[in-house]
Every structure is written in C-alpha cells, then in structure tokens.
C-alpha cells in the first residue's frame, strides 16, 4: 500500500475509543461479541505523542498494550449517515490504548465504569499521521505492534466488526464529532503485558508509526 506521510498539527478535542471491535480479541478476554459498537472516552490529558517518554503508572501491577488504528476527525458533524461518514475524517495512524488490566478486571466484576483503568494520563499513544488521500484502500489497512523487536499483535481494518464509517456514524448519534477529535477503532487479538524497559514500535504496512520505551 502506498501512503503519503505528512505532519498534521491540530488541537485534540475528544478521544473516542471502541471496545471489542475484533471478534478474536473479544474472545481472548472472555467477552461476548457486541451487537453494536462499545464506546468509551478518554480525556485530552490521556494523549501521548510518539517519541515522548512513557512512565509506568504506579497504581497498576498489570499494564497491557492494545494496538489500534486511530482516525483523526476533520469536520464537525452530528447524526452523520454512514454513507457520508468518510467525509468527516482525513487521516489515520497507529496508537496504543494502554490499559491497567488488573484495575479493569476489578471494575468489570463490580459493574463499574472503566475510566480508572483506561483514561489516565498518557494512556492514549498516537504515532505520526498518514493522510487517507494517500491510502489506496482504507478498508484493508494492515498494522502491527512489536515488543522488544518481536511481533506481538497484528490486525487489519478488514477484520473489524464495525468499519470506520460505521463507527463514526454511530458515535455521532450520541456525541457531536469535532475537528481534532480522535477515534481509536479497537484492538485485534494478542494484547499482553508490558513492563519497565520494554520497547514498543507500531507499524502501518511497512512504515514505523511510533517507537517508545517504557520507563
């Protein structure tokens, strides 16, 4: 796939995240495959740009990586029809939805929200942006994550339960989408633990999107 990489400067507004958007990932965590997108959010303070130091949070003993494709919203909208949704985002990258898995499991057992497990500072990593105008087929974007030079996760937009357009349309039924919003579109199977000293590198096709060390 040929891509055109360029820097995009924008103010981040909201960070939307989609859970259980790959069937195999839902199965590996023992979750049912949902009938509709599972949406949660992170605050702006969760954002961590590529090449910025990441420090292991002191409140968890089980930090997991979840590698995902991330969309950048380029147009304001509400109640967007799915067949027009592609007009509302213009760039894609690879990111990580860091999760304090031990805390998330405790919260899930109690039926409580996930914010303490997923929405803390620097829990939403993003790499460099790729303009979708340079992507030949956005329905077939391959991405992967390496931990310490070893492949640990790989996925493709073809394997998503809910497509980019479906996700953006669905979100807009409940929230306004605004220029600068981000959409983490879900993680494939292969999530796992990371520790201090690990190196994580995310790729889209053959291009490195981010490289980071856990300190």
Where are these regions (language model features)?
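Catalytic-core "active-site belt" of small-molecule-metabolizing enzymes
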Residues: 1-178, 182, 190-215
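Switch II (G3) loop of P-loop NTPases
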Residues: 187
